[in-house]
Amino acid sequence: MVKILWVDDEVELLKPHVLFLQGKGYAVDTCNNGYDAIDMARATAYDLIILDEMMPGMTGLETLPLIKEQRPTTPVIMVTKSEEENIMDKAVGSKIADYIIKPVNPNQVLLSIK
């Protein structure tokens, strides 16, 4: 079973997406900040990490290299509300696999996973 970690400070809004992915056979863990994401990525070998770019405390862009330090081969999909290219250029430069712009469509997530 494919294991996914979804990191977003608006974790309550993810419930429908998590249920959708679980219905498709994915195991999905969630957390709401970069610090927990780093701990969870250290403890579990996820097949994919979906990471929100804008979070209070440690942003997605700050969290990304720390996760990549521990799990260099784990693909990361960045989720952003912003369509500013420079933000995604920074993320792409930090080796993200893909990015999604909010509001997130569950089918968009499914396509990115595949």
List PLM regions with ranges.
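Receiver (REC) domain active-site loop signature in two-component systems and cognate sites
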Residues: M55
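C-terminal output helix
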Residues: N86, V104-I113
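Two-component/phosphorelay signaling modules centered on CheY-like receiver
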Residues: V11-D29
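Acidic catalytic/metal-coordinating carboxylates
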Residues: N32-D36, T59-E62
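Active-site beta3 strand of CheY-like receiver
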Residues: A45-I50
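Short amphipathic alpha-helix used as the core "switch/output" element in two-component signaling
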Residues: D39, L61-P72
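Alpha4 helix (beta4-alpha4-beta5 surface) of REC/receiver domains from two-component response regulators
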Residues: E62, E83-D98
